[in-house]
Amino acid sequence: MKTVSTAVVLAAAAVSLTGCATESSRSLEVEKVASYNTQYHGVRTPISVGTFDNRSSFQKGIFSDGEDRLGSQAKTILVTHLQQTNRFNVLNRTNLNALKQESGISGKAHNLKGADYVVTGDVTEFGRRDVGDHQLFGILGRGKSQIAYAKVALNIVNVNTSEIVYSAQGAGEYALSNREIIGFGGTSGYDATLNGKVLDLAIREAVNSLVQAVDNGAWQPNR
């Protein structure tokens, strides 16, 4: 009888534990360029975004499938940050077929606007590394950091002359750390989101540099 009672208690405990799953969510603030929501009284220059290629050695090993995911991700980030600067009219060239189809459905002429400049970009450096340390040969604890680094280059090309009229670069580093002390503490696996975070940071820095050039006259788009 005692054995049966113990089994019932254990079963009830197991059910209660399996029923304690929790779900949580929270919104996160998204980093924006420095000029976001700032006043600007100048002319907003029409620009489009051209190619954005991964020129680094990242994801280019013998097992790579040849698809430039890093460059594609970088281009999406660049378009967003350029639009948020309030200094340019960013023209979408990625979805021309869909836009043409919708204009045909609505019966309106597809009247595209031309760009004065094309922005091209390259991921010139990108890398990931793990850094670890031990305290008293690991007895007192150990730590590990995942570090991602990125550097990008932007070139502004005049569509009429093919002249590169201005260039900007940006670089950034992101780190994720965790520490275990005498057997206590969390461990973290490979975090793929660091790639996007550090890429966003580097591109944002390059775009901020571009905006500064417009504001201080180092690059005058309308001349």
UniProtKB/Swiss-Prot annotation:
<keyword id="KW-0472">Membrane</keyword>
<feature type="signal peptide">
    <location>
        <begin position="1"/>
        <end position="19"/>
    </location>
</feature>
<dbReference type="InterPro" id="IPR005534">
    <property type="entry name" value="Curli_assmbl/transp-comp_CsgG"/>
</dbReference>
<dbReference type="GO" id="GO:0005886">
    <property type="term" value="C:plasma membrane"/>
</dbReference>
<keyword id="KW-0732">Signal</keyword>
<feature type="lipid moiety-binding region" description="S-diacylglycerol cysteine">
    <location>
        <position position="20"/>
    </location>
</feature>
<dbReference type="Pfam" id="PF03783">
    <property type="entry name" value="CsgG"/>
</dbReference>
<feature type="lipid moiety-binding region" description="N-palmitoyl cysteine">
    <location>
        <position position="20"/>
    </location>
</feature>
<keyword id="KW-0449">Lipoprotein</keyword>
<dbReference type="GO" id="GO:0030288">
    <property type="term" value="C:outer membrane-bounded periplasmic space"/>
</dbReference>
<keyword id="KW-1003">Cell membrane</keyword>
<keyword id="KW-0564">Palmitate</keyword>
<protein>
    <recommendedName>
        <fullName>Putative lipoprotein NMB1126/NMB1164</fullName>
    </recommendedName>
</protein>
